[in-house]
């Protein structure tokens, strides 16, 4: 279920403050954040935000198509390595 339109999109106040500061100074720095739940806003376009995935910070370059989505959508928390493979021992037991 989505967030109420009356409330508006949620963005971490600290993250928003850092973005506004960089926009005023026309700087492009990587911003580290742990706030995966923050919604991507139009003023974030063009910045690189390092989103924490539980292990490391994943750099995410923000484009116009990402506006309205959450930061966590672009930093997967699980890495799928594939299902188990047959080994020589397991095939010999048959």
Swiss-Prot record:
InterPro entries: Ribosomal_uS19 (IPR002222), Ribosomal_uS19_bac-type (IPR005732), Ribosomal_uS19_CS (IPR020934), Ribosomal_uS19_SF (IPR023575). Keywords: Ribonucleoprotein, Ribosomal protein, RNA-binding, rRNA-binding. GO terms for molecular function: rRNA binding; structural constituent of ribosome. Pfam families: Ribosomal_S19. One of its GO terms (biological process) is translation. It comes from the Bacteria. GO terms for cellular component: cytoplasm; small ribosomal subunit. Belongs to the universal ribosomal protein uS19 family. Protein S19 forms a complex with S13 that binds strongly to the 16S ribosomal RNA. This is Small ribosomal subunit protein uS19. The gene is rpsS.
């Amino acid at each position: 279920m989505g967030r109420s339109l009356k409330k508006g999109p949620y963005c971490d106040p600290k993250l928003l403050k850092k973005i506004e500061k960089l926009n005023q100074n026309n700087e492009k720095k990587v911003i580290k954040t742990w706030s995966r739940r923050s919604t991507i806003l139009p003023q974030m376009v063009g910045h690189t935000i390092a989103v924490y995935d539980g292990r490391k910070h994943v750099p995410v370059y923000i484009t116009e198509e990402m506006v309205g989505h959450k930061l966590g959508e672009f930093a997967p928390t699980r890495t799928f390595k594939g299902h188990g493979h047959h080994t020589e021992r397991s095939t010999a037991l048959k």
